[in-house]
């Protein structure tokens, strides 16, 4: 046993169960195969079938859900629309997830975002509707001013095969008329409390047997732990999964050991100094765009055309 491995076993607490919040309820999930996607877990394990599979590659937006995740650069919780078809479930440890089924009140009263779609007749065949609703809900959570350009950005990652975009955009404009101070945040307060408290939990380290192989997923919280795993094993480094997710969903590759860097505090730092910018390996395109746009005006339009909001929310600049 190496000195580093001995240190890890003695001083770094680890666990194998995934802990997350789903539609306001805490879920404790026993070890799962590391490449189980969030979408498949929602549909097959939780029977939340509003989340649809359209393309299985993060392009169509039918699988869109909203996640709350801690942002080390802002030192708060950020809310993002993401493609659940290419996100692996263990990546969501410590996060809060909202699906379309979780928007209405317990009494069955529709969320204002859902009402906007109803009142503006913004659904035709309905297959894409949950994804559009969740993208608009992400804009609601972010308290964004939804002018025409912002609406286009918000829905850039959602496709409607019926081409019913006009009433969909009208629904978004309708939401913009609701004052920010009138938008409910009470239940999100509980979600944010859960996310922050999770930062103090043990590191996630999942090991399961599959086809005579051990499948492993490590999600260290500190750089020392990350380096130890990297140097003592031969893991595949996983950041946002916007490429690796397709290796699983499209190429059907069997991947045996993920080393996830999304929880490593030191790799989630963005610093500006006299020499330029120091961009951590876990910094997403969305965060980098917010930090650098004022310095590089010409990059603003380029970044808007890079992927979609769902992709920029998880895809990393460093790769």
Predicted segments with their positions:
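Glycine-rich loop at the start of a catalytic domain that most often binds anionic cofactors/ligands
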Residues: 66-70, 81-82, 247-261
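General beta-strand structural signal in soluble alpha/beta enzymes
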Residues: 218-219, 236-240, 260-261, 279-281, ...
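Noncatalytic alpha-helical scaffold of FAD-dependent oxidoreductases
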Residues: 209-210, 214-235, 252, 311, ...
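A gly/ser-rich beta-alpha-beta helix-loop segment of oxidoreductase catalytic cores
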Residues: 66, 155, 239, 244-246, ...
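Acidic, glycine-rich loop-and-beta core segments that form the ion-binding/anion-interacting portion
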Residues: 233, 244-249, 256, 263-268, ...
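A glycine- and small-aliphatic-rich helix-loop capping segment at beta-alpha/alpha-beta transitions
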Residues: 143, 177-179, 251-260, 293-297
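Aspartyl protease active-site motif detector
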Residues: 53-56, 235-245
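Signature of N-terminal electron-transfer/Fe-S-associated modules in redox systems
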Residues: 2-224, 265-267, 273-278, 283-284, ...
